[in-house]
């Protein structure tokens, strides 16, 4: 199964996450199929950037987002049917 999840990067006590499409059997920070964006929770304002068109494509192909990534996608207006225009 293909999943959309976060892969941790950064240093100790300074997390940084890549939002990736990966096989569910691969390690959290291991091999991935495509990088869709990133999430940086550290700083004055948490920074989130996602390629909405590619995320919508992978959702339409049956990729299952993790709970956290599903919340991010909903916040950004991405669904299985495509990108919602705001």
UniProtKB/Swiss-Prot annotation:
<dbReference type="InterPro" id="IPR000307">
    <property type="entry name" value="Ribosomal_bS16"/>
</dbReference>
<protein>
    <recommendedName>
        <fullName>Small ribosomal subunit protein bS16</fullName>
    </recommendedName>
</protein>
<dbReference type="GO" id="GO:0003735">
    <property type="term" value="F:structural constituent of ribosome"/>
</dbReference>
<dbReference type="Pfam" id="PF00886">
    <property type="entry name" value="Ribosomal_S16"/>
</dbReference>
<dbReference type="GO" id="GO:0006412">
    <property type="term" value="P:translation"/>
</dbReference>
<keyword id="KW-0689">Ribosomal protein</keyword>
<keyword id="KW-0687">Ribonucleoprotein</keyword>
<comment type="similarity">
    <text>Belongs to the bacterial ribosomal protein bS16 family.</text>
</comment>
<dbReference type="GO" id="GO:0015935">
    <property type="term" value="C:small ribosomal subunit"/>
</dbReference>
<dbReference type="GO" id="GO:0005737">
    <property type="term" value="C:cytoplasm"/>
</dbReference>
<dbReference type="InterPro" id="IPR023803">
    <property type="entry name" value="Ribosomal_bS16_dom_sf"/>
</dbReference>
């Amino acid at each position: 199964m293909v999943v959309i999840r976060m892969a941790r990067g950064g240093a100790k006590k300074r997390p940084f996450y890549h939002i990736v499409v990966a096989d569910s059997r691969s390690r959290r920070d291991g091999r991935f199929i495509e990088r869709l964006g990133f999430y940086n929770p550290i700083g004055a304002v948490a920074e989130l950037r996602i390629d909405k068109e590619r995320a919508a494509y992978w959702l339409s192909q049956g990729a299952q987002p993790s709970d956290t990534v599903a919340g991010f996608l909903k916040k950004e207006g991405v669904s299985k049917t495509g990108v919602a225009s705001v």
